[in-house]
Curated annotation (Swiss-Prot):
Coiled coil: none annotated. InterPro entries: F-box-assoc_dom_typ3, F-box-assoc_interact_dom, F-box-like_dom_sf, F-box_dom. Residues 4-53 form the F-box domain. PANTHER family: BNAA05G37150D PROTEIN-RELATED, F-BOX ASSOCIATED UBIQUITINATION EFFECTOR FAMILY PROTEIN. One of its GO terms (cellular component) is nucleus. It comes from the Eukaryota. GO terms for biological process: root development. Transmembrane segments: none annotated. SUPFAM superfamilies: F-box domain. This is Putative F-box protein At1g60370. It holds the Pfam family FBA_3.
Length: 283
């Protein structure tokens, strides 16, 4: 090649193909190379291609809470896909350390971690990508007189979007909202309606194929005709439900259950050590 000849630019399709095989940390760094590369790696096509290949090599996510230091560290390691293969020791990769002023309650979806932390006098939700180190502190949507609110993160597999559902406490009104991350949408989100007033029992939710499931309870009038009770509360009985929220159509459905239990998919396996550290394996 003569010195005066210019190298032909690499086709964008080839760049996307190459970088879709790289770790998330590398992709995050390459997004900062230029505006062109940043926009290229934000394309829905690249996101879907990268997620598809990432699912083919799943990883276990470990969260180590330092109880005395009010902080936690995030690690991950490859997940063995061959159950017949002889187990081997694997060194977990360190991703990030985060300091919080309260014990966060973790759950995850599509590689993101969702937890709560103290900001001033109030608890605010945080969504974090441990592989890239990026995080977003989300707004507290309820007014200051509201005591409690809950938030859940989920993935819309059709539109390829990460969304956050905010649910206010029943005593605080019906200010429920949905926020789509990575858009120009206002951080206050869009208000949505829920036909069933319910008490959320835990902010541990499970998102499967774009549908969020979480535990809740409602108060219903008792069908009993027994008037011998002196307690007005006996005129009502508790009804446990599983709330189903479809992130695609942004609609609620409800499954009435006759017993109280725990969503086993949301269980975090915890191991407390003598050093006052707790290791959570998020499934």
């Amino acid at each position: 090649m003569n010195g005066g000849e210019k190298l032909e630019s690499i086709p964008i399709d080839l760049i996307i193909e190459i970088h879709s095989r790289l770790p998330a940390e590398s992709v995050a760094r390459f997004r900062c190379v230029s505006k062109l590369w940043g926009s290229m790696f934000r394309r829905p096509y690249f996101t879907e291609l990268f997620l598809t290949r990432s699912r083919a090599r799943p990883r276990l996510l470990f969260v180590l809470q330092h109880n005395r230091k009010w902080s936690f560290s995030v690690f991950s390691s490859p997940q063995n896909q061959n159950i017949y293969e002889k187990p081997s020791f694997v060194v977990a990769d360190f991703h990030m350390k985060f300091s919080v002023s309260t014990f966060p309650d973790f759950h995850s979806c599509s590689g993101l971690i969702h937890f709560s932390m103290m900001k001033g006098a109030y608890t605010v939700p945080v969504v974090c990508n441990p592989r890239t180190g990026q995080y977003a502190v989300l707004p507290k949507l309820t007014r200051t007189r509201y005591e409690n609110s809950y938030s859940f993160v989920g993935y819309d597999p059709i539109e390829k979007q990460i969304k956050v559902l905010f649910m206010s406490d029943p005593d605080s009104g019906d200010d429920h909202r949905i926020l789509t991350l990575g858009t120009t949408e206002k951080m206050l989100g869009r208000k949505i309606e829920c036909s069933l007033t319910h008490n959320i029992l835990s902010n541990e939710g499970v998102c499967i194929n774009g549908v969020l499931y979480y535990k809740a309870s409602r108060i219903v009038e008792s069908s009993s005709d027994d008037d011998t009770s002196d307690d007005d509360d006996d005129d009502h009985e508790r009804s446990d439900v599983i709330v189903c929220f479809d992130f695609r159509c942004e609609k609620f459905e409800f499954i009435v259950i006759c017993f109280y239990g725990q969503l086993i998919n949301s269980v975090q396996l915890s191991l407390k050590q003598k050093s006052h550290q707790k290791l959570d394996l998020i499934i």
